[in-house]
Amino acid sequence: MIYEATGRYHRDMEGVLDTAGHALVKVNPARARRFAQAAGYGAKTDRVDAAMRERMGAVLDLDARPVRSDCMHEIRELHVARIGLVKDRTACRNRLHGARNKIVLTQLRARLRQVETQIEQIDAELHRLIADDAGLAHRFGILVSIPGIGPVAAITMIVEMPELGSMDGKQAASLAGLAPITRESGKWKGKSRIGGGRRSLRRALYMPALVAIRHNAQLGQVYTTLCSAGKPAKLAITAVMRKLLLLANALIRDGRKWTETAP
């Protein structure tokens, strides 16, 4: 059964249909609309949308994915709330630099303390939920064993890519938008670029990649080799991000923690 993601509104439907044993395929609304335009579906009605999604599923051979558990829904909601609070904290700190009025300063400091307390509360609840779920706790333990990946990055990877460990390296890189996209036609060859995929996951892997370059000999060598070959530092960091993701995928697939000799 194919349906479009509609935020919280499709969660009850997912639960009922999953319990009934239906295979579910959730598609991004933007991707569905692009397919509709390419296939010549100009009108947009419930009947047209249903026919379009049926055709989309047949043409693209979309794979069904397991429905998120109630625990994962809670973790995702907390994760999204934490992202918003981190942005609020940054905004408060920036405003504090320019504030001079005593009332404004007092309010900003109080708001900053409140935000930091709320972040701590969310972090504690996230760790509790993960610790109470044996499967998630196992995945979390594997991820934080990798040099560079801390608790926040590990939770982001669990939330943004629950498929980790169930796919091959190419699929993982493609889903994260870290697979180079070749651009060539005839004799013309453009520069390969990354794009698409899950942007929030790429953002979460950036700082871990920088740490891994310093503390993981294998990934540090990848960075050094590319830079020595004249590649831009940004490209080398992206390559490390991709290697880091592939390493996490392989370790979760094999059910083992990172060691110095891990591939």
What does each model-identified segment do?
Residues 1-263:
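A detector of single, family-specific signature residues
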